Amino acid sequence: MKKSFLFAMMLCCAQLLSAQQERIDLSGTWRFQADPMGFGKTPGSELYQAKLTESIMLPGSTDEGGKGMLTTARYVDRLTRKFEYCGQAWYQREVIIPEEWKDKEITLNLERCHWETTVYVDGKEIGAKEHLSVPNRFLLSKQMTPGMHILTICVDNRLKYPMDQWNHGTTEYTQTNWNGIVGKIELTAYEKTNIHALKAYPDIETRTVTLDITVNNTTGQPTNGLLQLVINEKGGKTVSEQSFPITLKEGSNQLIKEISMGKNIKLWNEFTPYLYEVKAMLTADNKQDSKNITFGMREVTQGKHHIQINGRNVHLRGALDCCVFPLTGYPSTTIEDWKRIFLTVNDYGMNHIRFHSWCPPEAAFHAADEVGIYLQAELPMWIKDVGQYPARRDFFEKEMYAILEEYGNHPSFILMCNGNENEGNFNVLEDLVKKAQKHDNRRLYSASTARTHTPSDQYYVSHVTEKGWITVYEGKPSTDWDRKKESDIDCPVIAHETGQRCMYPNFAEMEKYTGVVSPRNFEVFRERLARNGMLHQADDFFRATGAHTVLQYKEVNESLLRTANSGGFQLLGLADFPGQGSAFVGILDAFWESKGLVSPEKYRESCAPTVLLARMPKRTYMNNETFTAKLEIYHYGEHPLKRGKLNWELKDGKGNTVKKGNISTPAIPCATVDSLGKVNISLNKVSHAEKLTLHTTLNDTYHNEWDIWVYPCQQTAADDYVYARTYDEKVKTALQQGKKVLLIPENVKGRKTKFASHFWNPHKNTCSFSYLAYASWCRAYIFPIHSLYRVYYDNIRHHVSYAV
């Protein structure tokens, strides 16, 4: 016990020393010089040898610093940057290296640069890096001797390779093509014998973790040392404590250690996101170096139809993150910001985020580890000519390896894909998958999100398989359908970018845009309304179309929950996508905040680990028919459900019961879609046209409901109305006589309509999709004050129909 205590204290002291003396934080005011024409590297104009005269704050971007061109444009297809800058930008400051750092290895860490970054020390070039997804690191041991030095960094945000315009690593349409360094900026000193890398490979079957440790020895000669390893439950008790004598050759040394985690391991998953900490300390030549990581005891495997976490099928209820950060124009590098997003995702019943054609900073992985969110990261790849440009191919391969090295320990990182809807030479993409699988087996890999299924795919995200469409964009008049046949292929399939139903913008949101982008697209849309004399109806239009989108997403989600062999879905979106034509497709705004359209509790009725489902052959009935519904349960909760009781009740618009009953339910295992029973209800007591609602509740805990519409089978014509299908002489005469005419034309010129609202948005690809032959609308807004609607509403003043 005493030995354990002393060892822990020694390790703690070593870490404190590291934190206090071996890092220099370089955040703050830097000198700055714009260089959009790129002259700063040419002979005679060397900015890296000059003292820059302007100033800027780092971490940050040129947009935040007010550098570049002040814009006046008003883009309707995206948010507009207030300041646009493209090209080389120079950042400079003095740094003082302490005497204690003499003879140490010194690294410059630049987190989240955009894009190519070249470093100079005292006017001499050190090198360039081009990572978009991981920190750019530069070894400065020879240059950063004790004393003062001038550190100059050139960041160039011009596209280095042909990247197309859409990928979310470089696009203007979401995060913007900013210039700067927006994460940690620091110098770090290490001993010449140091722990360079530490990876954890958990094995839940043997209850062990294999630690892969890379130790660098730059002393110029072999040496001996002591490696001490401590594994703790994060914030809790010690699990293992070991030390090993080691012999190190000059250069890089790989050490493999398998460590028992004990009998009572805590597994990581969405319900129990337990984490462990590894603290490694190396003592060599009477000097110490340490490195810490966190990991989870979790295993990801490919099941027949589902991704499996720790041997159990999971169903991914996911949403997309397309790198939308309206205040900064770039992704956050703080854990708390990401926890807020992931907790919101969890509040709405989801367990998964796909990072669409980009990879987030490490803070996102840490936050997902803690919250219990399954992540899919991607390369910044969305291209139509895969295989072209060898330099670009090399960039993607290096970026892939860098992502795996940087974020591979995180248990939330369960999926990796090359990118979005790629086209071209898929042999190149499959080669990347094979290399990734060989390099790191701690997650599953796929060649491309959509377009082509390759033999190496361990899962497949797509609109369609060889057996048909799996993505669902809208509901149907029936709910007695699913995508089971279409999902039955040789690996788990996840429905790609479901939903995408457009709603009207919420102009009240405009005041939130206090950062680097301006909502000038909102301004244009608002002015159009004003010109047409409808600005006073803007909020009504937003709420009407928003209610309709909520209704459609209920249908979309439930259709894939009914699909027992579905691997999951990725909704587009839970939050708005303000680019590519201004796609207001989210029930949350671009800030991941509620629009006030639906509460998390209500949304979870149709999107949660446990959801009640109803298979109905239709939704409209005559009152001489019998309403039927087959009731099911989707259960991917943490624990099996005990035997219980399902209560059902059909109510009218006043809350009166048409009929009710209950069904005894069996025990429900986890990871299943099971039948619960059937209801048959005669509708002969319904005397007039009205909407009825079927309410279901299981064990007083889980609730869901569905609307149906019932009409009288005996049609009666009002005496004071003339009913007509064409405008003819009979109609004219009736009107001249002062009679009322109900005209329902048979043939109307114009485009067809359907229940679903506009796909994505009306401004992008308006001729690209066959179903856009239908009218481009976001649904109807109806005041039910006409006598036609009186049968539906008792109190006209207090009812507004937001969706027909």
Language-model features and meaning:
Residues K749-V804:
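An acidic, glycine-rich "communication" segment
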Residues K129, G372-L379, V741-P745:
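Short hydrophobic/aromatic-enriched beta-strand-loop microsegments
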Residues D720-H763, A780:
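Short alpha-beta junction capping motif
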Residues R23-D25, W101, M144-T145, Q308-I309, ...:
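Extracellular/periplasmic catalytic domains that process cell-envelope and extracellular macromolecules
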Residues F342-L343, H352-L588:
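Substrate-binding/catalytic cleft of secreted carbohydrate-active enzymes
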Residues R31, H114, R158, E423, ...:
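Short, solvent-exposed loop/turn segments at secondary-structure junctions
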